[in-house]
Amino acid sequence: MLCREPRLYSCQRLKEAAKRQGHEMDILDPNRCLLKLSQNPPHFQIFYQENSGSKPYLLPDYDAVLPRFGTTSTQMGCSVLQHFEGKGTFCLNSSQAFLNARDKWKSLQLLLKTGVPVPNSFLSGGEVQAQATIPHISSPTILKMLNGSQGIGVILAEKPQSAVSIMEAFKQTNISMLQQDFIEEAGNADIRCFVIGDQVVATMQRIGQDGEFRANCHRGGKTEKIILSDDEKQIAIRATKAIGLDVAGVDLIRSKNGLLVLEVNASPGLEMIEKTSGVDIAAEIIDYIEINAFINLR
């Protein structure tokens, strides 16, 4: 497992599930990996340094790799994943799918291209004056940093001029922001689906604190059980496939025009959705790896 914080709930649950099913799992920090490319075989080698004073050693051949790195490690994490892919190792998820999911704008493009419904969204180039975007801004509107996570970098602007002021401020630090229609009828609630392969294995509704439009659990929101229709589940599965992921956390919102996909997460947390749904998602992931890594080895 590629993970920078092995003590996190999700990493511990996955390691425990693997052990219960008779597997050994190493947890590797992608930022401690050394990657080597060579014209002569073996073409792809990965070395690992346990700590700053130790000598890097050659990693063994693994049957499967499970990436669980955060947004700050996306570049190196995906480089390590690509190296494992070069070695022919089964990776859940692929490096390209990870990159697709971590780019908020690209993921929206991929979703809409494959017919998955998303909120009306807008992105302007760095040389476009923020004032010129006013005709395209809904009121109120949501502003999102392109690489934010856990609700960080998501801002509600009540009026178009407020949105312009916020964008101008962020532009000074070379941070681009996308705009999305605010789905007022959803209140401060959204839905998280956990998709593995062709199945939605768990769901939960997230509800933000009073006065907080973001429903993320990291922002103090609460969760409760929710049942989705088969059509709603299919939207979550289609969204996962559109990004190229095998395992994903898909965030949905119910609007007056139907269900919309807000985001597709490549490394979704397990804690709140396991505790809310009662589903052993960690075991489901290990089961999926067992089946697909075996096919990959044949």
UniProtKB/Swiss-Prot annotation:
Q: Where is the ATP-grasp domain?
A: 108-290
Keywords associated with the record = ATP-binding, Ligase, Magnesium, Manganese, Metal-binding, Nucleotide-binding, Protein biosynthesis
User: What are the binding positions for Mn(2+) 2 in this chain?
Assistant: E263, N265
EC number, UniProt record: 6.3.2.-
Specify which residues bind Mg(2+) 2 according to the UniProt entry for this protein. Answer: E263, N265
Note describing how the cofactor binds: Binds 2 magnesium or manganese ions per subunit.
Q: PROSITE patterns, from UniProt? A: ATP_GRASP
Q: What is this protein called?
A: Probable alpha-L-glutamate ligase
Gene designation: rimK
